[in-house]
UniProtKB/Swiss-Prot annotation:
Belongs to the WD repeat BOP1/ERB1 family. It is found in: Nucleus, Nucleolus; Nucleus, Nucleoplasm. Residues 38-50, 80-91 have a biased composition (Basic and acidic residues). Component of the NOP7 complex, which is required for maturation of the 25S and 5.8S ribosomal RNAs and formation of the 60S ribosome. This is Ribosome biogenesis protein ERB1. Residues 51-78 have a biased composition (Acidic residues). The gene is ERB1. Residues 1-91 are annotated as: Disordered. The lineage of its organism: Eukaryota, Fungi, Dikarya, Ascomycota, Pezizomycotina. It comes from Ajellomyces capsulatus (strain NAm1 / WU24). Component of the NOP7 complex, composed of ERB1, NOP7 and YTM1. The complex is held together by ERB1, which interacts with NOP7 via its N-terminal domain and with YTM1 via a high-affinity interaction between the seven-bladed beta-propeller domains of the 2 proteins. The NOP7 complex associates with the 66S pre-ribosome. One of its GO terms (molecular function) is ribonucleoprotein complex binding. WD repeats lie at residues 433-472, 476-516, 613-651, 654-699, 703-742, 758-788. InterPro entries: BOP1/Erb1, BOP1_N_dom, WD40/YVTN_repeat-like_dom_sf, WD40_repeat_CS, WD40_repeat_dom_sf, WD40_rpt. Keywords: Nucleus, Repeat, Ribosome biogenesis, rRNA processing, WD repeat. SUPFAM superfamilies: WD40 repeat-like (SSF50978).
Length: 788
């Protein structure tokens, strides 16, 4: 018996069994093991080739799949074992047909249990006398894919009807007969057909028949559904309830617990290779994104391009045309996600809201958003654009020529600080001993001794190099020592100290006997002259030259000048016979604020009888180093007076709010050909004045954070320095040449920091060494420092 699965013969009419028997394929079926024999009822010796009927099921159908599942068992059902089966080796020609467990005889009659069903075939004899099974034609019902063929249908296939234009027929039907060409309607019939359109009229011609193409009701309904974008299938529900296959039931274990493969999150190297091939082809020009059209292709497509502005001549702008200024580019604060430092806090937001719109710095408040899609509309957009339009057509425009100059070329070429050495850079010696602030200090003309005075009312003399205290004297228990200065001449050593309303002239007992005797003679020479002058003079002065008390006399104090008012400034003349004092107090009378004292005569003079016009009370005064000129500074101006002519020479206007100190260049009018001075102010300014150049400052330096207390020139080196309340000293190089056409050059050199800021006060005074590039500073922290 042949293989059941490989057969594709016609299926016999069968009837389902109550129990589905097991069937095994021919490869697995052992015919020798069967107990039953083939039945031998009739036709035992007839036609061995046709004696066997293969009953085959279509295994590709659904029934076949069910049978495969049912016949997987290795056991042979008892129903089949009980049926007689004919073996191939037996010569019996009789055929017993078993259709799904029912017996069919060779005469075409059903066995037991199959009397009610009708066979779909009949058995006849062929030309050789063998049996022949003739099956009935299949009459398809409505559910069948088979349909009756239209005998009048044209069977020419896809051949165009134009091939039959020369023939009276248009094709052949299924029986091979010619299909004659339909009669053509007259013009009147065509008009009537166009007026009264039949149902299903399309206006088209059926290519297979040549007749007008008409659609039936089903086809019209199909077209309507397609036109209305509806589902063409009848009974289709597009909104069927969703069946949740996985989420409807709670799963304890995962459906698939396999780990994610590496290819899920690693870029594919094969795709990378293919992409690199495409990139290489694009770079080499073998792949073009848009294939350019050739002239021939453009001509075939009928595309012609014309340049509308080929013959257009450019029109010149108006001579007075000025383009509109561009808007400034947006800043960080206009970003939808600005840095945190650009976002205002609650206090800044409240201040912005309380400010008038005209006084606000910007028209908006920076805001932070996570994404650009969350940024709302700008409510002032229309207003901003409207104001921009107003500015464009209402505001006048001015064309300004822009100079293309390198900013660095405008800066002076300053030398390197390394080329300008020597200058002080480090702290060499620290002087400790005062209790309280050290207000003033000075180095003697020999450069060996340092004198200092402070709030404790004492004057101390130190050895400059070692920092050892040599001598001290207490001048007052209540008043501080405001100013202390050495006599500039080297033939005698006299120290002038201003304490309260008195000036003490001191000869420290630290000198050799000859120098000490010469110093005492200079101070004592004026006592007899002062006595004679007082007896002969009719004018009375408030300043009194007196001898000190025995205790002060033993300490080295040789004379005391009582001014009656507190002196804050003291300056010697270059010859050492005159010194000027200034009492800047508001209670000081105008005529007594400035006093010039003569050491050799013990004489005090008040050169100013009237108040200086403008600028407030006087602050400091200095003698010119080579001319009989006195410079007097009040709060806002500096005046120079010729003492020989008793006239005003010049008024300098530094522009500072409150002048604290000033100093005159030591080589003024000798080698430089002009006067130069520096001015320090409480508003943190350091000003350089060239007197011959202008009454205004030549340079203004703003390097300090707090008020400047003192400024000083070096006597031999082109150096000057200033001291500030921020606890620092700044060293500058200032060179002055004799060429009147060249200006002074100023180079910042060094910032010296070491003093502590105490009570909002830092460095109160400074002085230069007469020979070396050293300077000393006095601080509010109670120390003095030597910078070398």
């Amino acid at each position: 018996m042949g293989d059941l699965k490989g057969s594709r013969k016609r299926k016999a009419v069968t009837r389902d069994l109550d129990e589905e028997p097991g069937v095994v394929s021919g490869d697995e079926l052992n015919l020798d093991a069967l107990d039953g024999d083939l039945s031998d009822k009739s036709h035992d010796t007839e036609h061995s080739s046709d004696s066997e009927i293969e009953l085959v099921d279509d295994l590709s159908s659904d029934d076949g799949e069910e049978y495969e599942d049912e016949f997987d068992s290795d056991e042979i059902p008892s129903d089949i074992e009980s049926k007689p089966i004919r073996e191939k080796s037996k010569p019996d020609r009789g055929v017993d047909i078993f259709v799904r467990g029912e017996e069919v005889t060779s005469d075409g009659e059903l066995g037991d249990g199959y009397d009610d069903d009708k066979l779909n075939y009949r058995v006849t004899k062929d030309a050789n006398g063998n049996e022949r099974y003739i099956y009935d034609e299949i009459n398809p019902d409505d559910n069948s894919d088979y349909s009756e063929a239209d005998e009048n249908a044209n069977t020419i296939g896809n051949i165009p009807l134009s091939f039959y234009d020369q023939y009276p027929h248009i094709g052949y039907n299924i029986n091979g007969k010619k299909i004659m060409r339909p009669a053509m309607g007259q013009a009147l019939d065509t008009l009537l057909d166009s007026i009264e359109l039949p149902k299903g009229f399309t206006g088209l011609t059926d290519p297979s028949t040549g007749k007008p193409l008409e659609l039936n009701q089903d086809e019209l309904e199909l077209l309507r559904k397609v036109q209305m974008n509806e589902i063409t299938e009848d009974g289709y529900d597009p909104y069927q309830p969703t069946i949740e296959y996985f989420t409807s039931k709670l799963e304890i274990m995962p459906l698939n617990a396999a780990p994610e493969p590496k290819r899920r999150f690693v870029p594919s190297k094969h795709e990378a290779k293919r992409v690199m091939k495409l990139v290489k082809a694009i770079r080499e020009g073998r792949i073009l994104p848009y294939k350019p059209l050739t002239e021939k292709a453009e001509a075939e497509e009928g595309v012609w391009t014309y340049d509308l502005w080929a013959n257009e001549t450019p029109r010149a702008d108006h001579p007075m045309h000025i383009p509109a200024p561009k808007l400034p580019p947006p800043g960080y604060e206009e970003s939808y996600h600005p840095p945190p430092e650009y976002l205002p806090d609650e206090k800044e937001k409240a201040a912005w809201l309380n400010t008038d719109p005209e006084d606000r710095e910007r028209e908006y408040l920076p805001a932070d958003y996570d994404a650009l899609r969350k940024v709302p509309g700008y409510d002032s957009f229309v207003k901003e654009k409207f104001e921009r339009c107003l500015d464009l057509y209402l505001a006048p425009r001015v064309r300004r020529s822009k100079l293309n100059i390198d900013p660095e070329s405008l800066l002076p070429k300053l030398p390197s600080p390394e080329e300008l050495k020597p200058f002080p850079s480090t702290c060499a010696t620290l002087f400790r001993g005062h209790s309280g602030r050290v207000r003033t200090l000075a180095i003697d003309p020999t450069g060996v001794w340092l004198a200092s005075g402070g709030d404790d009312g004492t004057v101390r003399v130190w050895e400059l190099l070692t920092g050892r205290q040599i001598w001290s004297v207490k001048l007052s228990d209540e008043e501080p020592v405001n100013v202390i200065r050495w006599r500039p001449s080297k033939d005698a050593v006299v120290l002038a100290a201003a304490t309260g309303d008195s000036i003490h002239l001191i000869v420290p007992p630290i000198l050799d006997p000859e120098m000490e005797k010469a110093s005492l003679d200079i101070v004592d020479a004026g006592w007899g002259y002062a006595k004679t002058l007082t007896s002969d003079s009719t004018k009375k002065t408030s300043a009194q030259w007196t001898r000190p008390s025995p205790s002060l006399l033993d300490s080295g104090v040789q004379a005391v000048i009582s001014l009656g008012y507190v002196a804050k400034s003291l300056s010697w003349h270059r010859r050492g016979d005159y010194f000027v004092t200034v009492c800047p107090g508001t209670a000081t009378p105008v005529s007594l604020a400035i006093a010039i004292h003569t050491l050799s005569k013990h004489l005090t003079q008040h050169p100013f009888r009237r108040r200086l016009k403008g600028g407030g009370p006087p602050q400091a005064a200095h003698f010119h180093p080579s001319k009989p000129i006195l410079f007097v500074a009040n709060q806002r101006t500096i005046r120079s007076y010729d003492l020989s002519r008793q006239s005003l020479v010049k008024i300098l206007q530094p522009g500072a709010r409150w002048i604290s100190s000033f100093d005159i260049h030591p080589t003024s009018s000798t080698t430089s050909g002009g006067d130069n001075l520096i001015v320090g102010s409480y508003d943190r300014r350091l000003l350089w004045h060239d007197v011959d150049l202008s009454p205004r400052p030549y340079k203004t330096l703003r390097y300090h954070q707090k008020a400047i207390r003192a400024v000083r020139y070096h006597s031999n080196y082109p150096l000057f320095a200033d001291a500030s309340d921020d606890g620092s000293l700044q060293i500058f190089h200032g060179s002055v040449t004799g060429d009147l056409l060249s200006n002074a050059s100023i180079v910042p050199l060094k910032v010296l920091r070491g003093h502590k800021v105490t009570g909002e006060l830092g460095v109160l005074d400074l002085d230069w060494h007469p020979r070396e590039a050293w300077c000393v500073s006095a601080g509010a922290d109670g120390t003095c420092r030597l910078w070398t």
